[in-house]
Regions:
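Conserved catalytic cores of very large enzyme subunits
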Residues: 1-298
Length: 298
């Protein structure tokens, strides 16, 4: 942390003496404007961003010169996600957000993997389970894997340190309608439920007392199928409210209002509260994940 502060002072000096136009520097000194984050400006780092976790998990990525291929289970996907979070946090100075919807497809990958394992075990002992029993065994093991994966993210984020000596400022986005189909939506609901349960429980401090971790922050989206009592996912909203009452997270976003304000789109803020403006790529598609914020001026 001290090294980061020292580097920041050097950057601030270079920014005011050499990099910024004189009129901008003078306006900042006189209080007409405030040029933010001059302690990082010399290296042209960006502030906060939305991590395109989906692209890196589905198509693979490279970390420290090592090829990371598409994961073959939910728990591995969660582990890779924490590595990506650490690398992103070490190369920017603001917050970052990931979406649980980008992890949801790997629940079914694990489901099929576990099913094959259970069938193999049947053959080993020379017996065959009825289909309903087989499905129940698979789902029980799957829930254990989801618990393990969510716990990996929770504990990795609060225990790892970035290159500037801090834990990553991470926000986790929980948006059911981001799922691509009904099966994936149900799987996403399981991840959201486990995330809320673990946050409600908290983590133990050095004295063994359950406390509220600072990160990751949580954002829960209110939508048509979880806002009304009796709706399919209302139980998640009840759990979220219970969690907020005890742990002060999640924060909430109204899908309906955000779509009114953001040209029909609903997406996470970047870390804390900075929210992107709608933008379309060269193909006319809205793009949010993979974008960042830089050069803030008040």
């Amino acid at each position: 942390v001290q090294r980061d502060y020292m580097a920041g002072e050097v950057s601030r000096d270079l920014t005011t003496r050499m990099l910024l136009p004189h009129d901008i520097v003078e306006a900042d000194r006189e209080g007409i404007i405030h040029f933010h984050d001059s302690d990082y400006y010399a290296q042209h780092m960006h502030n906060c961003d939305l991590v395109n976790l989906e692209d890196m998990l589905q198509n693979g990525t490279v970390i420290s010169g090592t090829m990371i291929e598409k994961p073959h289970s939910f728990s591995t996907a969660c582990n890779i996600a924490t590595q990506i979070i650490a690398q992103v946090a070490s190369n920017q100075y603001g917050g970052q957000s990931i979406s649980l919807a980008h992890l949801a497809p790997f629940v079914d990958v694990s489901r099929e993997k576990i099913r094959k394992e259970v069938i193999s075990e049947q053959e080993l002992v020379g017996m065959e389970y009825p289909e309903d029993v087989l499905n129940e065994i698979v789902e029980r093991r799957l829930k254990k894997e989801i618990t393990k994966g969510v716990q990996t993210i929770e504990y990795q984020v609060i225990t790892l340190m970035t290159t500037n000596g801090q834990a990553p400022f991470l926000t986790v986005f929980m948006y059911l309608n981001e799922a691509k189909n009904e099966r994936e939506k149900k799987d996403l609901a399981m991840i959201i439920e486990e995330t809320l349960r673990q946050r409600y429980q908290g983590v133990k401090n050095e004295a063994g007392v359950w406390v509220t971790p600072a990160f990751p922050k949580l954002i829960y989206v209110l939508e048509e199928d979880n806002i009304e009592e009796g709706s399919e996912y209302y139980y998640l909203t009840e759990l979220a409210a219970k969690c907020t009452a005890k742990r002060l997270v999640p924060d909430y976003i109204s899908e309906k209002k955000m779509k009114e304000l953001k040209e029909g789109n609903c997406f996470p803020v970047m870390g804390c509260r900075s929210c992107l403006s709608p933008w379309k790529d060269e193909n006319g598609n809205y793009k949010f994940y993979g974008r960042f914020n830089q050069g803030g001026v008040t």
